[in-house]
Amino acid sequence: MPRIESGAYRLGQLLLTKHKEENFANIARGWSLLAEGGTLVCSGSNDDGAASLEKQVGKAFGLDGTLSKFHCRVFWLTRADRAPPDYWRELASLRPVGDGSWLSQPGIFAWDRIDDGSALLATYLPEDLSGHVADFGCGWGYLSREALARSPGIAKIDLLDAEHRAIEAARANITDTRASFQWLDLTQEAAPATYDAIVCNPPFHAGRAAEPGLGQNVIAAAARVLRPGGRFYMVANRGLPYEPLLKANFTSFETLADNNKFRVSRAIR
């Protein structure tokens, strides 16, 4: 969701995730939005590291109370004179990462690195992409940046992602006027246009669990909005069941690369 930039709330509630740095950032943000004496309630699964996080938050702030049941826990703290560690606060905003040429933050896919699968796909992006292009599940913008650099014929590229923080990061990382940005969940919402080409590293996790259906929904969405003859470039973990969907929804497809971990495919609508 879009960030709440300021506030003085008496109560805040935070659902913890599986990512430690994201939790640090969210707790720092939640604390900053509390009024003096306000309470922040955090809840999460022990499988996602909530027990360990509870100890770290207790050391940083002191806790007012905890509850534990059904492999989950809740703990809460009061905003008083102890502020979040500086590192936690830094994680709550976009910051230079990697080689320093791009900005990101926890909560974005592969937030502090170039994903290996995306890097492999980028090497197979052609130099003749043109017209209206889209990046489905754009993350912080790596594939779009590579596509724009390789293909001067691109007239416009739409960057779409279900994570609002990813869109904020992509907007900061790509200043090319051909790029536009939209916060949109392609598994639930229709893409905003039809396209001559789409690049994609589809999501396949919900929490810690693998959910191939997420990627399948994104592939189906791409097939619906590609123009006849349009090209779909995709990378995925090679064990995911995507080929039957490519075969059913596209005129043809081929494997461009297979390194025993990732598979790069090109499909023609």
Language-model features: locations:
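Glycine-centered, small-residue-biased loops immediately flanking beta-strands
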Residues: G38, A155, G230
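A short glycine-rich, Lys/Arg-flanked "PGG" loop and its adjoining helix->strand segment in the class I
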Residues: F24-E36, G215-P228
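SAM-dependent Rossmann-like transferase core, predominantly class I methyltransferases
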Residues: S68-H132
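Conserved SAM/SAH cofactor-binding pocket of Class I
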Residues: D116-C200, A206
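Short beta->alpha hinge that forms the Motif I/post-I loop of the SAM-binding pocket
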Residues: S45, D161-R165, L214, N237-R238
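N-terminal auxiliary segments of SAM/dcSAM-dependent transferases
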Residues: E22-V97
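Short SAM/SAH-binding signature in class I
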Residues: Y9-L15, Y195-P203, Y233
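Mobile active-site "lid"/loop adjacent to the S-adenosyl-L-methionine
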Residues: A197-R224
